[in-house]
Amino acid sequence: MEIPPVQQTPVSMSMNHSSYPVRCLHPTSHTQHESAFSTAAPHSRPLGYPFSMNPMANHPGHPYGNPYSTAAVTPVSESRLGGFSDDDNERLYHFSRTDKSPDPTDQRINGKGKKMRKPRTIYTSFQLQQLNRRFQRTQYLALPERAELAAQLGLTQTQVKIWFQNRRSKYKKLMKQGGAPPPAVGTPNSSAPNPVQQQSGQPGHASPPGAPTDLSDQQMSHGGQPNLPPRAPSQGQPQNGDDDAAWAAATCHDQRRTNADLLPTRMGRQQYQSHGELHELSPLLPLSMALPGTAAAIPTTPNIERQQQYVLPPVNFLQRL
């Protein structure tokens, strides 16, 4: 007798699979089950049960089923979906398969299988000019300022933010490599005249009468003789700034001055008069260097002619002293 076992099998199946909503919505007859079980006979398991013990494991239409077990999906779709219409089978089949491939538009993979970087933003010269100008004013932008600048330049706020981040990094890197800019060299003593320049007689630094001078600070040239300033042309004497030593020697020989010609003044300087001109002689300069026949240079000031002319007393008065 083969009929009783066939009648008991659908009853047990209906009891075991009564929890499926698909089976409840689509009732089938016993003849359909018989045809379905007859086709699934080669795939029968022990005890004549063609399915696994877990009713949710290989169900193609169940959302918790295994979508990757293609070997089990094929016989189940032939056995379980045999009584459904073609539209239901196609709908359940597509519902069971889940496509795990990402969207082709989101793929940024090059030929080596690595993720490609986003394309670099190319800024125009006008945009770079405005961005640099704003960076000079402030290195950090608030949200309203960033939105306003982005709308003004036709950029997104993200592009403006990234540009400022890169610019700050570059600025910090330059400051770390080059260090802080050197402080401006102050010139607090630039207004005070240099005593060496005063003694050398440079224009604009004339030494006042009676100011202390130090010949040791002067640069000696021409065999130990102090530098002489260019003398103003007077009485046919040649003017040559490079030949100061020859000019000093010629002046000493022409004047033929004596010790009586020297006159101490109140300002602590010694003055001598020659050819109607008044000259000053530093008290630190030895008198032997000022005598005729010596090649000593006598420091003078360039504006000596503008100074007040002192009237010397008669020679007889000097001899009495």
Swiss-Prot record:
Signal peptide: none annotated. The keyword Cell division does not apply. It holds the Pfam family Homeodomain. GO terms for biological process: cell differentiation; regulation of transcription by RNA polymerase II. Residues 79-118, 173-244 are annotated as: Disordered. Residues 116-175 bind DNA. Its main location: nucleus. Residues 90-106 have a biased composition (Basic and acidic residues). It comes from Branchiostoma floridae. Belongs to the distal-less homeobox family. GO terms for cellular component: nucleus. The lineage of its organism: Eukaryota, Metazoa, Chordata, Cephalochordata, Leptocardii. Residues 187-202, 215-224 have a biased composition (Polar residues). GO terms for molecular function: DNA-binding transcription factor activity, RNA polymerase II-specific; RNA polymerase II cis-regulatory region sequence-specific DNA binding. This is Homeobox protein DLL homolog. The keyword Cell division does not apply. Keywords: Developmental protein, DNA-binding, Homeobox, Nucleus. SMART domains: HOX.
